[in-house]
Amino acid sequence: MTKKQKKMLYRILIAAVLFLAAKFIPMPMLVSTALYFAAYVTIGYDILRKAWKGICNHQVFDENFLMAVATIGAIALAIYEKSGDYDEAVAVMLFYQIGELFQSYAVGKSRRNITALMDIRPDYANIERDGKLEQVDPDDVAVGTVITVQPGEKIPIDGEIVEGASTLNTAALTGESLPRDVMTGDEVISGCINMTGVLKVKTTKAFGESTVSKILELMENSSSHKSRSEAFISRFARVYTPAVCYSALALAILPPVINLLMGNAASWGVWVYRALTFLVISCPCALVISIPLSFFAGLGGAGHEGILIKGSNYLEALSKTKIVVFDKTGTLTQGVFEVTGVHHSPMEDRKLLEYAALAECASSHPISKSLQKACGVELDRSRVTDIEERGGRGVVATVDGHSVAVGNGKLMDELGVKWQECRSVGTIVHMAVDGEYAGHIVISDVVKSDARDAIAALKRAGVQKTVMLTGDIKKVADHVAQELGVDEVHAELLPGDKVARLERLLGEKGKDDCLAFVGDGINDAPVLSRADIGIAMGAMGSDAAIEAADVVLMDDDPMKIAKGIQISRKCIRIVYENIVFSLGVKLTCLLLVAIGIANMWMGIFADVGVMVLAVLNAIRALRTSKN
């Protein structure tokens, strides 16, 4: 409990003692009245001050104004009627402050829970100077500096291990408890906890550009992206509060005036009392507090699972997802390509692979890496000149003075080279040397072990259609789609074709439905940004993915897509539960007040009780079920 909350608790206890003494201990009316006023001022002075400031700043209509008018009006009515019955005025203020304290504590607790879940900010970095370790601010560490990370410490900055081996706990980033073994030469990212050995890490980024900084910035900015529900509640409160104030004024004045015109007693006291109760009930605290809290808790719960959602607007859109479009490589497949065959080559297989690897040496594509791996020797890049990338088709380069073309059938057709079909399932890389066909290499990608379960989980979560887009050949794409149970597949697409195909799918979806695109974030930025929801998988350490996507999965587990949808739908369900419950109870009580059935005690429940229940319900969004 914070210092401010403790102070409020003491005020509540003092006011409660004074209130109970005045209510239940026999004493002269003057003494009991003094105790009531002492209790009222003790518990309500800050509400009265805020209400007065609001009036001075021309921001009249808020919950402080409602509470101040209702309670001062109740006191004035008691004085007018000479009843000495001030207990309702004090009780309204007392229970309102109890509700505010509970709400403050609950929100603070949920914030601390979320902060603990995302407690990845490093406090310092160790730099060795004169044989001793010196702790410095991570912001002061230059790129290329060697830092020491001891067991139990967080890795403060992204870098590469230059000495040592250890096991890393990545749970704060990925939500997974399985540790990761690392050794010299491995890249490590900030935010992971070093569990066993001492590591020396050469930093590759400044702290401000490291993974931990990007994630923290994302989480801190998520509250600025408001959902439609939050925006509606804000607009609703601006209209609702003045409306109920004027309604209460009408309830206090019109019925007595009508009674007078009809020759009956005005009964001013009865109708003013009802109007004051009307004000107590109408306070919109339950909605104004619980709706943002529900989204905040939902974002925190998702973050605990390694699913970073950039704002409540994206959380709301994710809950409406009916179509999920996948980029094949790196999402449904591991993106780890292996050479599985060399066919129809007049050259030696080793020579063919060497030429192919050299021609592709400037590319970062997984196929290029697999060719270099299959070659098995260190490549001398000085043997390669005039490298020309042909988008979506391949590459043409000069290797040892020979013109070497490496790519798909479209590249061979473009160069006028007659090529041969291959019946093997996989990516077929055709080669031509000096304009003559030199054979083809079969490269196969490995389907992720849980990809099929992920597609099934999406169907269970209510996704109506799954689609796969790939630049791979149709035969390979169809094979993968059939194996995984994907509904629709589009193959042999150039990067621009993927955007066009996505546009077509966007036109086919329902008006209120959303389409999510899932990619690895490396070269999917145009498609990620065009989809209703862009989801980047395996983004741990990828700046591009964190920047381009709306939802970032910190590891490459496709099951987390369905998990994210489930979390978002639970959060939205809680939001709607709170809206319906809060408005339902308040409207019912307002009606009962207007016809004289409900009193101010019922008004206290309709305000404070509903707020407490709504806040408790909102906190449920922080908890995520384990599948």
Language model: regions and residue ranges:
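Conserved cytosolic catalytic loops of P-type ATPases
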Residues: 116-209, 313-356, 398-399
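Membrane-water interface of transmembrane alpha-helices in multipass transporters/channels
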Residues: 29-37, 61-68, 81-92, 232, ...
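Transmembrane helix-loop-helix hairpins at the membrane interface
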Residues: 2-124, 235, 242-243, 342
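Juxtamembrane coupling segments of multi-pass membrane pumps/enzymes
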Residues: 65-66, 91-151, 182, 309, ...
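Conserved catalytic phosphorylation-site environment of P-type ATPases
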Residues: 63-71, 173, 273, 283-359, ...
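P-type ATPase nucleotide-binding
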Residues: 339-465, 474, 483-502
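Soluble-to-membrane junctions at the N-terminal ends of transmembrane alpha-helices
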Residues: 1-16, 34, 45-75, 216-250, ...
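Conserved ATP-binding TGD loop and adjacent catalytic N/P-domain core of P-type ATPases
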Residues: 399-401, 427, 433-577, 585
